[in-house]
């Protein structure tokens, strides 16, 4: 069962604080680790990530979108793993994820899975995904291209994240200028794992766009993106 939650964030605004406290409230027996990039206003005791040459870089994407860090949130996950390689599993939640129940109440037996994400992009549906279309023709030849999205509601067992991180570090330049969620899904498939969701309508709770979810505080769940106080 999951004991460790990675809380990815970039500021200490009111919504971040609200959602961080709710995650801790509804999961009192779990460790919640705040994680963020350097040069940001982070929560106390955060794991601070410094980008390194040993990691992929998204300089082209970041310049296109005017943000130095937005497209490479996956680096937070790999870096945290490298500093904490002995946890049994890693459950990732972003700062704009609202919850009103425990992980067990929401995910149930899915927490015993090797990995899951709320939306998956495989060879069956990836061609129309925006971040896939942004790849160069050469990048599209990379084997096992896939995507998981958003970077919240993700589960990785230790062995899974270990293999992904090892493959990434073995050839970081191969993964330059790939959007983080594309890099995550590709690494998962390259390591031999199937992209899976925790349950059939998981995209109604956690998605990349608020208009795609059914946000109902009377129903127990984890919801993303929630960028306002509730």
Where are these regions (language model features)?
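Active-site-proximal specificity loops/subdomain of glycosyltransferases
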Residues: 36-86
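Short loop->beta transition adjacent to catalytic acidic/histidine clusters or analogous donor-positioning motifs
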Residues: 2-4, 26-34
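N-proximal low-complexity "stem/linker" segments adjacent to membrane-targeting elements
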Residues: 1-14
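C-terminal catalytic/acceptor-binding lobe
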Residues: 170-230
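Short beta-strand-to-loop acidic/aromatic patch adjacent to the donor-nucleotide binding site
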Residues: 87-96
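Short acidic, S/G/P-rich loop/turn micro-motifs used as interaction or catalytic elements
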Residues: 11-16, 96-100
């Amino acid at each position: 069962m999951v004991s460790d939650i990675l809380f990815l964030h970039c500021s200490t605004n009111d919504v971040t604080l609200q959602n961080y406290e709710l995650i801790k409230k509804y999961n009192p027996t779990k460790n919640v680790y705040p994680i963020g990039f350097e040069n940001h206003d982070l929560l106390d005791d955060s794991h601070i990530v410094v980008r390194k040459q040993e990691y992929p870089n998204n300089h082209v994407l970041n310049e296109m979108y005017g943000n130095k860090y937005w497209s490479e949130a996956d680096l937070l996950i790999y870096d945290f793993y490298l500093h904490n390689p002995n946890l049994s599993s890693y459950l990732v939640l972003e700062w704009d994820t609202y919850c009103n129940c425990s992980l067990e109440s929401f995910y149930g037996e899915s927490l015993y899975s090797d990995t899951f994400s709320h939306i998956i992009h495989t060879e069956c549906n990836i061609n129309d995904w925006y971040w896939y279309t942004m790849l160069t023709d050469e990048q599209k030849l990379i084997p096992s291209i896939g995507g998981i999205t958003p970077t919240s509601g993700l589960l990785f067992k230790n062995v899974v994240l270990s293999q992904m991180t090892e493959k990434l570090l073995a050839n970081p330049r191969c993964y330059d200028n790939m959007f983080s969620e594309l890099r995550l899904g590709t690494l998962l498939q390259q390591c031999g794992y199937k992209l899976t969701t925790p349950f059939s309508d998981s995209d109604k709770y956690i998605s990349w766009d608020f208009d795609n979810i059914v946000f109902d505080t009377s129903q127990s769940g984890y919801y993303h993106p929630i960028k306002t106080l509730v």
